[in-house]
Amino acid sequence: MEPVPCLLLLLLPLLRASTDTPEPCELDDDDIRCVCNFSDPQPDWSSALQCMPAVQVEMWGGGHSLEQFLRQADLYTDQRRYADVVKALRVRRLTVGAVQVPAPLLLGVLRVLGYSRLKELALEDIEVTGTAPPPPPLEATGPALSTLSLRNVSWPKGGAWLSELQQWLKPGLQVLNIAQAHTLAFSCEQVRTFSALTTLDLSENPGLGERGLVAALCPHKFPALQDLALRNAGMKTLQGVCAALAEAGVQPHHLDLSHNSLRADTQRCIWPSALNSLNLSFTGLQQVPKGLPAKLNVLDLSCNKLNRAPQPGELPKVVNLSLDGNPFLVPGASKLQEDLTNSGVFPACPPSPLAMGMSGTLALLQGARGFI
């Protein structure tokens, strides 16, 4: 038998075994993205070493507890021993999900990541357990993040979790996303000012509501806030939202209230003076709300239940207006939206039939400018 075919025959069992037991971590050919899925009952955690060259890293823990790593490494008091290794990492974006992690381990890792160039951190489907260690010195020693995203993360300290986590991050956070939170009733007296935060996204918290929004928007803790997203956040009235914003002292330029069931409001809203973009799509509105800001750059009223075109005087002065997907433009759209929404599905906005190469929005704008 020729040597080369013979060698291939000998390797076949190894190749078959390799396909049957794939590595939990995969690094792409450009050393940019690395994804680990430790879903096996006894995962090979050492496979994560493959991700050391990557810029974007995702670690999915398969629901396992990371308690064993707390016993193996003292990241809290002896973090400098890891400094050289962490400084060499290229990672800029890190996602960790589906694990149970002891609080000392999580905060210890954050402290070690202070030596890294990490800019974006996302935690998803995580249960933080145990008691946190004492806070670090006054100067924060954690990573200098620009973006922090948290989805379905449970903390052992209730409303104090944000202030506790904040102590382990360097100042300068610009974007904060919190979805499916177990509590947003923060201990505001303990929360430090987010002086650089321009974007706050509290979407996908249906139990929040206007009262919860007052507790979440700690007064005068978000002085630089420009973009506020509250999609599917249990908002009921525009007046209630406006009151919460006023109490918190925030002046967002962009406000997203889409996917909330808004009802008709008898009280007029005192809008933030800086507001120039308002998204009210998928809110079930049957008419244009009264008391909208006098002037907006962007107003999105698409995918609602408007049965007629807005009348003169109902709309503010607006540069970019979207009314696509309303019943007066798309016959049957209202019934379709109601059926899908009741089933828990948020449909894509139906396209408007208006216009020969022109979107319904642009076509309507041309007609609307006569009475705006």
UniProtKB/Swiss-Prot annotation:
Keyword Cell membrane: yes
Intracellular or extracellular location(s): Cell membrane; Secreted; Membrane raft; Golgi apparatus
Subunit structure of this chain's protein: Belongs to the lipopolysaccharide (LPS) receptor, a multi-protein complex containing at least CD14, LY96 and TLR4. Interacts with LPS-bound LPB. Interacts with LPAR1. Interacts with the TLR2:TLR6 or TLR2:TLR1 heterodimers; upon interaction with ligands such as diacylated lipopeptides and triacylated lipopeptides, respectively. Interacts with MYO18A. Interacts with FSTL1.
Main location: membrane
Extent of the signal sequence: 1-17
The entry's keywords: Cell membrane, Disulfide bond, Glycoprotein, Golgi apparatus, GPI-anchor, Immunity, Inflammatory response, Innate immunity, Leucine-rich repeat, Lipoprotein, Membrane, Repeat, Secreted, Signal
Region (Required for response to bacterial lipopolysaccharide (LPS)): 287-372
One GO term (biological process): positive regulation of toll-like receptor 4 signaling pathway
Disulfide bonds: 25-36, 34-51, 188-218, 242-269
UniProt topology in membrane: Lipid-anchor; GPI-anchor
Comment on protein domains: The C-terminal leucine-rich repeat (LRR) region is required for responses to smooth LPS.
Organism: Oryctolagus cuniculus (Rabbit)
Protein name as catalogued: Monocyte differentiation antigen CD14
Source taxonomy: Eukaryota, Metazoa, Chordata, Craniata, Vertebrata
Glycosylation positions in this chain: 37, 152, 279, 320
Residue numbers with lipid attached (GPI-anchor amidated asparagine): 342
